[in-house]
Curated annotation (Swiss-Prot):
This is Small ribosomal subunit protein uS15. SMART domains: Ribosomal_S15. It comes from Protochlamydia amoebophila (strain UWE25). One of the primary rRNA binding proteins, it binds directly to 16S rRNA where it helps nucleate assembly of the platform of the 30S subunit by binding and bridging several RNA helices of the 16S rRNA. One of its GO terms (molecular function) is structural constituent of ribosome.
């Protein structure tokens, strides 16, 4: 379950720090959050899809590590991002 190009560009434009920013932690976390949301919806329809469930757990772990990194380097940006994405942390 990957994101289509248009969705990815839209998320990138919304969360980028400057015009050419495509790889900052903010953008990566936002893209991972969208992928996690899509996989969660997929797993509601197909609860026996264990491969997707494992992929979901991997993505959640990756997002958690990026959030921890952002929190340790720039707490204000971390809080802003969590509020924008409506994450429970």
């Amino acid at each position: 379950m990957s994101l289509d190009k248009g969705t990815k560009e839209e998320i990138t434009k919304k969360f980028q720090l400057h015009e050419k920013d495509t790889g900052s932690a903010d953008v990566q976390i936002a893209i991972l959050t969208e992928r996690i949301t899509e996989l969660t919806e997929h797993l509601k329809r197909a609860p026996k899809d264990h491969g997707s469930r494992l992929a979901l757990l991997k993505l959640v772990g990756q997002r958690r590590r990026l959030l921890d990194y952002l929190n340790s380097t720039d707490t204000k940006r971390y809080q802003t991002l969590i509020n924008k994405l409506k994450l429970r942390r």
